[in-house]
């Protein structure tokens, strides 16, 4: 929430590279949840602006709510699809889940995606009573670029240039906690932190030549310009630029074998939040790549846990599971809420 001067983002024509994923042939909805599909939190192009809400089928509200946008390197406007396993895990633990989509980098450049996400939060808060939700327990979560969205929601509260005027206005877009799976946090350092050989794999997989510094790589496409030639824009789109003591408690998870977003991006985020005095836990999981499914796998994984400003602190080596995640959210947002 520290205020920085936001440069004007100038769109640079970048040829289409990353095809958007088509709709799933058969979407499996979360068990144990009542679904409200196709809600519109703002009028946006394509599938952007869509929100699917899943409320626990057991118990009584108002339920705490987690907003989740599925990662895609900002190349898809279908962030409301793919988070169904997350919604199922959280719904059985007493949390409502809103899966929502923002504009892709082809539809609009930064800060449009943050404007969209804040509009989604305002929509949820404005309709909390109608949907049986607790407006004072709103959490942002996501993976990869979706984790970036969640983190930006956490660290940019009070930034007028990032609030936008989409959808419902006059309602707070503040979130009370963040869960971040392997998000990019400092665009200018990503390439230098890649694992040995990872840039070769990245270049081959995504059709680029200069790893994350390429004009057609995810980050440059997001800001509509080269991150190297326009470092001011790259910094403005990096969560690290906004961190201060008022940011919400944050749980971070990253695998050490991630060849898409290096785990040092999460190390930087943890260090910055720690320095600002923000309650934070960081789970660094050995031999795990760009994938959050380990949290539901039941496997025992070598996990290094760092924490700051948490009482009690998580124990060393604690396995990150959905029980651990919801216990963190319970502690940081006002106590347990479980189906009865």
Residue ranges: model-predicted function:
Residues 246, 252-254, 258:
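Short beta-strand/loop motif that positions the catalytic acidic residue
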Residues 62-71:
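Short beta-strand element of the alpha/beta-hydrolase
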Residues 22-61:
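N-terminal cap/lid segment of alpha/beta-hydrolase-fold proteins
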Residues 108-129, 323:
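Alpha/beta-hydrolase active-site loop
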Residues 119-200:
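Primarily recognizes the serine-hydrolase "nucleophile elbow" in alpha/beta-hydrolase
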């Amino acid at each position: 929430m520290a205020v920085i001067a936001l440069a004007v983002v100038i769109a640079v024509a970048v040829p289409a590279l990353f095809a958007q994923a088509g709709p799933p042939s058969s979407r499996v909805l979360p068990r144990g949840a009542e679904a409200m599909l196709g809600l519109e939190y703002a009028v946006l192009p394509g599938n952007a602006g869509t929100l699917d809400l899943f409320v626990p089928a057991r118990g009584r509200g108002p339920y705490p709510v987690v907003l989740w946008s599925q990662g895609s390197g900002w190349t898809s406007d279908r962030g409301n699809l793919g988070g169904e396993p997350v919604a199922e895990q959280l719904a059985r633990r007493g949390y409502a889940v809103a899966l929502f989509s923002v504009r892709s980098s082809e539809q609009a450049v930064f800060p449009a995606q943050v404007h969209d996400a804040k509009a989604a939060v305002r929509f949820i808060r404005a309709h909390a009573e109608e949907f049986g939700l607790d407006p004072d327990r709103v959490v942002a979560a996501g993976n990869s670029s979706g984790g970036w969205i969640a983190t930006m929601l956490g660290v940019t509260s009070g930034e007028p240039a990032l609030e936008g005027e989409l959808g419902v206005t006059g309602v707070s877009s503040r979130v009370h906690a963040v869960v971040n799976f392997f998000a990019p946090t400092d665009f200018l350092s990503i390439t230098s932190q890649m694992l040995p050989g990872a840039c070769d794999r990245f270049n081959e997989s995504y059709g680029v030549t200069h790893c994350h510094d390429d004009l057609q790589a995810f980050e440059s496409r997001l800001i509509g310009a080269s991150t190297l030639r326009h470092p001011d824009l790259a910094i403005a789109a990096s969560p690290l630029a906004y961190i201060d003591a008022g940011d919400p408690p944050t749980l971070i998870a990253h695998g050490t074998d991630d060849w898409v977003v290096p785990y040092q991006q999460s190390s930087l985020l943890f260090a910055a939040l720690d320095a600002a005095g923000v309650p934070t836990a960081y789970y660094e999981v050995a031999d795990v790549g760009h994938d959050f499914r380990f949290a539901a796998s039941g496997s025992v994984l070598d996990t290094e846990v760092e924490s700051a400003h948490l009482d009690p602190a998580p124990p060393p080596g604690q396995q990150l599971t959905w029980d651990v995640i919801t216990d963190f959210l319970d502690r940081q947002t006002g106590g347990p809420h479980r189906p009865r």
